[in-house]
Every structure is written in C-alpha cells, then in structure tokens.
C-alpha cells in the first residue's frame, strides 16, 4: 500500500512539474496572464475532433499552403561572431492531416501574458514545441528566409514582433511603445534620432530594439522569480477549468493605460500618477465546459478604501413584492438589479472624488466641490424612498403590430410631398417594475399628467399618450404594493390594478434575491418567437442549432463577500453532446457550412 501511495504521489508531482514547465519561464511581474489547460481540454475532446471541425480544417488548409519544397539560406552565428553560410534542401513533406503534426505540442499548456514598463508594453505567447524542424517547415516562404540561426536559439524579427524558439519552446512577442513616454522624454530621446528620421519610424526603430532585448533576456536567461511561485495566480486556477485569466491589478492597469496616451493626446490625464482609479484590484476568471452547461466564473477584488462604499451600495436583497410580480415560468427573459439608492447617493461624492479625481487629477478640487454641493442639494433619504434601487425588466412576449411611418412622394415636377404609410413590425411586450415607497407622490404626478393631457387614467391604469410614429406600442402604468409598473400590455396593467396576480414565482426567486444583478434569457423560447424569413442561410442554421441544443442563459453578479464581488455567465444546454466544448465545435461546424 505504501508503495502504491508513493507511486501516486510521484506521478502527481511529475504531472505538476510538467504543467509548470512554461510557468517557470514566465516572470512573476506580468500584469495579465491567460493559461489554457491542455490536460482539462483533452479530457473533453480528442485531437481528431479538432481536425474534423471547421476551425481545424481552416488551420490545416493554412498549414498545407506553406508545406512545399524550399531552400533555406540560414546564417549560423557564434559568440565570436564567426559566420558561415549553410544552405540545404528540405524535401517536400506529406500533406499535414492533423493539427498535432505542425511541430507544436498542443497537449501541453499554452500561455498568453501581458507585461509593461513606462515606455513599452509586450504581448507574449508561449508554447512548447514537439518537433522543431516540423514547426519550421510550416512557416511561410518569406519567414523561412528570415530565420537566423544563433547559438541555442532561432529567431525571426518582424516589424514589431519577434519569434524565437529552440528545440523545446516557442515564444512570440509583439512590442507596443508608449506615446506618452516619447512625449514626456522628447528632448532626451530626440538625440537618438538618425538623420531625416521622423516620429513614427523613430518610435518603431527604438521599440524594435527594446523588444529584441526583452525577448532575448526572457528566452535565454533563467527567470529569478516566476509566475509558478505566485500563490495568487496558482490559487486563481480552478479545478477542471479549461482556461484561466488572471489580472494582477485591474485599477492600476487602467491607470497605466491612461498614462500611455500621453499629455499631447490627453492632457487632462497627464498627471494620473500611480493611483488605482477604479478601486478594483485582482481579477480572475475561469472557463468551464461541463456536460450540460458552459460557464465563466469571475472574481473581482475591491481595494480596502472602496470596500466600505461598495458593500453599502450592493449588499441589498430585492423586495419580494418585485420578485413575486411576474410569472417566472412564462418570462422569455428578465433583467434585475438591486442596489441601495439612499446609500448610493450618500457614497457618490466620495466615489466621484476617488474615481474621477484620480483620472483627472488637475480637477481634484473641483470634484470635491461638486461632491459637497451634491450632498447639500440632494435629499438621499427622500430619493431613496421614491426609487428604492430595486428594478426588474421582464420580456413577456413578441407580437406583430402595424405601425405608421413617414416617407416622401415626388410628383412629375419633382416636388416632394410627405406621405404617411403603415408597415408591420415585430415589437416586444414587456413590463418594467421599479420599487417605490412613495405611492401617493407618484399618483399625484400622474394626476398632473392627466390635467395637462399627457396621460389618461381609467380603472387605476395610466395610459401614456404617444404617437405611433415615435414608439410602435402603447405604454401603461400602475402603482401598486410599493411597485411602479410600466407595461406594453393593457390586459397585464388591468390585471395588476385589480390584484389578480396568481403567478408561479418559485423558479427564479432565489437567483434574483441572492444576487445584486441577474440577466436571464430562455434561449429556446425567444428563438421560437423570432421570424426568420429575412435571415441568411447561416443565420437560419445557427438559429436551428441553438433551438435544438440550448436551454437558457444566465448572467449574475453576487453581493459582496468580504472584499470580493463574483459573477457568472452560464449557458445551459439540453445535454445532447458529451460536453459543451464538443457542442461548441458542432455549432461552429453547422454555421460554417
């Protein structure tokens, strides 16, 4: 038994080491990192599934386009700068029949990472190679001629990108210089310009030099501190996730983005400094392909100085009056939001100063005054009673309606005459519900509207007087049980006014009340309502496939837990395939036909 346990531990350790081979070559100070987990992906699909898919066929088509006889004129350079010509004929290979036969090890993890300095940012792609010569044979004829053979690596230099590889790894890097840096350090950098060299070509030349040095250092030197030892990144990777996104500090990333614009383009942002302008720190996301649903889970950490405000605004449960105000089983789609209006208004001045004061530091004092005046003028409690912060928009149905529109007719003398015509339009039937504890005030407002002939009131139902040319549907309103209703259905409005609301309200009650925001759509039901006579062949095929295979989609944002706000996007299917990744490939195949 001990030997078995020891063997299992050894295998587990080996697997972990293999998975972290490339991670140990990625610096710990990267700002954004996306990792594709090959082990989890190939538990879901086979290489042959990719080869047979529309995506795989396109990849193979491109690979075979370059897969012909060619002559390589390569230069081998040593540390002593000795050069010798090495010319050899490469025989024509057989047609590539699988994406696994392109030299890249597709069953090893792949990584994209973004790193930056104050002068330049780098987009990096790192993968493992299975066969260097095979990989090189897949390059275009032009790129094959650009290969430079160095001691320990091979390199192709493009205009702003560099490819470097050896027998084991391939690194692709694209450098993007900061205009802001060149503006700030113009006097010093201008001394490096060559004769008759203009701004764009100068920036490209300098940026290319920086990029090459960065690439050679990254590829050839051992990374002292790698992302493999970063506990936050390692913790962000969830079990069974096919891919993981990790952002070190979103707020600081956006700050640096503003700074990179430069004072010449965005003078207001010139002095942003090193402030986290949005108060959002670490962001992580994980992608899952399960049997009957595909999911993206996202976690967002809020900075300590923003946590207090966010918690007061978002930690509110939606009123049951709203949750129980529609039939959960019949809704085609709905969007809900629940925030504390009173607390939002109270926190607004401080948030205004922290967020926009950081973006526009030159106007920080003005921001503070605006915030103070806002607090002085606004009665947060009164507005919080008028609009509680609970809102629900429900799509009930779609219908065909004849609507008027204006066009022009020309007589024999080419004089224009306005003509009113009618056409059939596909319009939504919806209900908007807004929480309010000021029923009397709202009814007074509608009475005033009736006095000025803007609305009609009958049986406690308010009908807005609108031109059919402005909106293609009628609009009705009812105030009942601390809820303001706006609906396109007169029948629905009368039912609400009479209190005849025997709805099924169990299906989504927990989902809505446990989250600050929810967007739900019954994909199948919505698609069955949409006419397809004007759709293209591919659109009809996409619609047919979706109707046959999808159930519903949900996007939700949780209330704050600690200093974290979590969200989830989930697409549920009918489970017709082994997993949703296979279903995704089938969908692409169907649309691509």
List each model region and its residues.
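Generic recognition of long tandem-repeat/solenoid scaffolds
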Residues: 151-158, 295-303, 460-469, 484-488, ...
């Amino acid at each position: 038994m001990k030997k078995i346990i020891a063997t299992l531990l050894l295998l587990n350790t080996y697997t972990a080491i293999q998975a972290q081979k490339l991670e140990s070559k990625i610096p710990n100070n990267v700002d954004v990192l996306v990792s594709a987990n090959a082990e989890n992906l190939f538990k879901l699909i086979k290489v042959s599934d990719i080869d047979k898919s529309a995506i795989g066929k396109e990849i193979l088509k491109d690979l075979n386009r370059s897969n012909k006889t060619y002559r390589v004129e390569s230069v081998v350079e040593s540390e002593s700068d000795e050069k010798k010509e090495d010319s050899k004929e490469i025989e024509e290979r057989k047609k590539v029949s699988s994406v696994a036969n392109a030299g890249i090890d597709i069953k090893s993890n792949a990584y994209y990472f973004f790193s930056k300095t104050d002068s330049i940012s780098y987009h990096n792609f790192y993968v493992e190679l299975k066969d260097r010569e095979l990989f090189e044979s897949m390059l275009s004829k032009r790129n094959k001629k650009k290969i430079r053979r160095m001691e320990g690596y091979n390199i192709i230099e493009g205009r702003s990108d560099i490819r470097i590889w050896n027998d084991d790894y391939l690194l692709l890097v694209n450098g993007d210089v900061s205009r802001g840096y060149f503006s700030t350090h113009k006097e010093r950098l201008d001394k490096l310009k060559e004769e008759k060299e203009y701004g764009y070509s100068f920036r490209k030349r300098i940026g290319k030099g920086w990029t090459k040095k960065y690439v050679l250092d990254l590829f050839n030197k051992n990374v002292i501190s790698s992302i493999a030892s970063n506990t936050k990144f390692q913790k962000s990777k969830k079990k069974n996730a096919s891919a993981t996104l990790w952002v070190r500090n979103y707020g600081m990333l956006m700050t640096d983005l503003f700074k990179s614009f430069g004072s010449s383009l965005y003078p207001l942002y010139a002095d942003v400094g090193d402030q986290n302008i949005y108060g959002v720190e670490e962001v992580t996301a994980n992608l899952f392909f399960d049997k009957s649903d595909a999911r993206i889970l996202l976690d967002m950490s809020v900075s300590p100085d923003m946590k207090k405000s966010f918690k007061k605004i978002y930690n509110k449960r939606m009123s049951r009056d709203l949750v129980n105000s529609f039939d959960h089983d019949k809704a085609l789609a709905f969007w809900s939001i629940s925030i504390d209006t009173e607390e939002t208004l109270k926190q607004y001045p401080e948030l205004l100063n922290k967020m926009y004061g950081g973006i526009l530091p030159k106007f920080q004092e003005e921001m503070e005054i605006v915030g103070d005046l806002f607090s002085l003028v606004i009665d947060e409690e009164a507005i919080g009673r008028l609009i509680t912060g609970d809102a629900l928009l429900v799509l009930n149905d779609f219908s065909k309606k004849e609507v008027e529109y204006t066009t022009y007719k020309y007589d024999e003398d080419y004089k224009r005459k306005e003509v009113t015509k009618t056409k059939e339009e596909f319009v939504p039937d919806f209900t908007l519900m807004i929480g309010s504890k000021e029923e009397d005030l709202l009814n007074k407002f509608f009475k005033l509207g009736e006095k000025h002939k803007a609305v009609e009131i009958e049986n406690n139902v308010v009908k807005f007087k609108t031109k059919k040319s402005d909106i293609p549907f009628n609009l009705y309103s009812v105030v009942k049980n601390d809820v303001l209703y706006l609906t396109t259905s007169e029948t629905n409005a009368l039912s609400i006014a009479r209190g005849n609301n025997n709805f099924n309200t169990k299906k989504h009650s927990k989902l809505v009340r446990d989250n600050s925001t929810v967007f739900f759509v019954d994909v199948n039901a919505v698609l069955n309502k949409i006419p397809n006579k004007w759709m293209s062949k591919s659109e009809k095929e996409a619609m047919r496939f979706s109707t046959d295979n999808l159930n519903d989609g949900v996007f939700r944002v949780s209330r704050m837990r600690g200093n974290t706000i979590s969200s989830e996007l989930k697409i549920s299917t009918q489970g017709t395939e082994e997993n949703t990744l296979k279903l995704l490939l089938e969908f692409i195949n169907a649309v691509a036909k």
